[in-house]
Regions:
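Positively charged n-region of N-terminal signal peptides that target proteins for export
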Residues: 1-8
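C-terminal motif of bacterial Sec signal peptides marking the signal peptidase cleavage site
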Residues: 17-20
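N-terminal leader/targeting and pre-domain segments
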Residues: 25-72, 178
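Short active-site neighborhood of thiol/selenol oxidoreductases, capturing the structured segment around
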Residues: 69-81, 93
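The canonical Cys-X-X-Cys-His
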Residues: 83-87, 148
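Typically the conserved alpha-helix immediately C-terminal to a functionally engaged Cys/Sec
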Residues: 87-100
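Thioredoxin-like thiol-disulfide oxidoreductase module
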Residues: 109-156
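Non-catalytic, surface beta->alpha helical segment in thiol-disulfide oxidoreductase systems
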Residues: 141-178
Length: 178
């Protein structure tokens, strides 16, 4: 159900940005200026997303790492147009971001301009996101898309990998964890 998914993403983004995943209920210091280098994100490959007027700004793996290293903050998504779950996720993320009035930093997992697979960028991304990547049945960790990550004060305060966009796949327990 589309409405349930929007509610779940809204709750996730609001909670992650305001509180993170710590037990402390302190609000992060978002007053300090932290500028992330961005570029105009080409979202034309996402079928259900307007190519202009969306809430995504392009950024790079090095900017994600700098955000962590320098104590910055932001909501990032690692996605690619050839991924069905990514197609669905980007539409919902955009709607939630519009409602909240926030921009989401988009890292294109299949970019020619900023390649990831088979490059040093993959190693950097893997290192930064390591704790958020679940182990497979062989005990190995592989990057997956889509992955949404919220960073507050340089710490990953929450993440969501993949989708359960059927709505009925989310339980009350899942929502309360967000």
């Amino acid at each position: 159900d589309r409405l349930l998914m929007k509610k779940v993403l809204s709750i996730l983004l609001i909670c992650l940005v305001l509180f993170g995943c710590t037990n402390k209920q302190e609000k992060p210091d978002l007053s300090k200026e932290f500028v992330i280098e961005t570029y105009k994100a080409d979202m034309s490959g996402y079928e259900n997303l307007k190519s202009s007027g969306h809430m995504f700004v392009g950024t790079t793996v090095s900017e994600l790492k700098r955000t962590v290293d320098e104590g910055g903050y932001g909501v990032f998504v690692l996605s690619r147009t050839g991924c069905h779950s990514c197609q669905l996720a980007m539409q919902y993320l955009n709607e939630v971001a519009e409602e909240l009035g926030v921009y989401i930093y988009y890292i294109d997992a299949q970019s020619d301009a900023y390649p990831i697979l088979g490059t040093e960028n993959y190693d950097v991304l893997y290192e930064v996101l390591y704790e958020t990547i679940p182990e497979n049945e062989n005990g190995e960790r592989d990057l997956q898309t889509p992955e949404v990550v919220t960073i507050v004060d340089g710490k990953i305060t929450g993440s969501q990998i993949g989708t359960t966009w059927g709505g009925s796949n989310y339980t009350d327990k899942d929502v309360s964890k967000l």
